[in-house]
């Protein structure tokens, strides 16, 4: 069994590698967390696509964070109505709190300082190299989620 620190580092690297290879934030994070749990499916990045760019460029929650929430759900969520939501909810609340403490917000447009739903915002994103910031959000969201999942399973 992989040590917790190694598990967390591998998930972070996997998410960052997927992001720098062309997948977007939510896609990269959920895929990294799924693979770390031995889950392989082409459905996962598809499910996450519309969460990228702050909920499809609507100034919503950061896609890296929503991808991490989906990954937590894969590990701790329920598959039957009689199962408890408590483990997944508690882990998700902790994830959101830590992400907000780290970056000061959970909202894409606040984190980046631009609205990706506008032409001006997209130009600012490109011209100011803000994708580098998204790589950081992607890696950290994956790291926090992996640590929380690892702690919950130990």
Language-model regions: role of each:
Residues 1-21:
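Polybasic, low-complexity association/targeting segments
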Residues 2-5, 32-50, 114-119:
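Acidic-glycine-rich active-site phosphate/pyrophosphate-binding loop
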Residues 13-20, 52-59, 126-132:
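A short glycine/serine-rich beta->alpha loop
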Residues 25, 62, 108:
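Short cysteine clusters
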Residues 36-47, 74-94:
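Phosphate-handling active-site elements
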Residues 3, 91-154:
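C-terminal binding/interaction regions
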Residues 51-70, 74:
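Glycine/serine-rich anion-binding loops at beta->alpha junctions
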């Amino acid at each position: 069994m992989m040590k917790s620190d190694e598990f967390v580092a591998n998930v972070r690297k996997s998410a960052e590698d997927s992001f720098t290879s062309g997948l977007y934030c939510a896609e990269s994070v959920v895929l990294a967390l799924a693979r770390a749990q031995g889950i392989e499916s082409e459905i996962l990045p598809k499910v996450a696509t519309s969460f990228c760019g702050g909920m499809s460029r609507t100034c919503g929650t950061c896609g890296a964070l929503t991808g991490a929430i989906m990954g937590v759900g894969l590990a701790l969520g329920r598959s039957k109505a009689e199962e408890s939501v408590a483990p997944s909810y508690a882990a998700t609340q902790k994830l959101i709190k830590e992400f907000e403490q780290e970056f000061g917000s959970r909202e894409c447009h606040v984190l980046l300082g631009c609205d990706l739903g506008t032409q001006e915002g997209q130009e600012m994103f490109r011209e100011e190299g803000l994708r580098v910031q998204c790589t950081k959000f992607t890696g950290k969201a994956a790291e926090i989620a992996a640590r929380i999942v690892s702690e919950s399973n130990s």
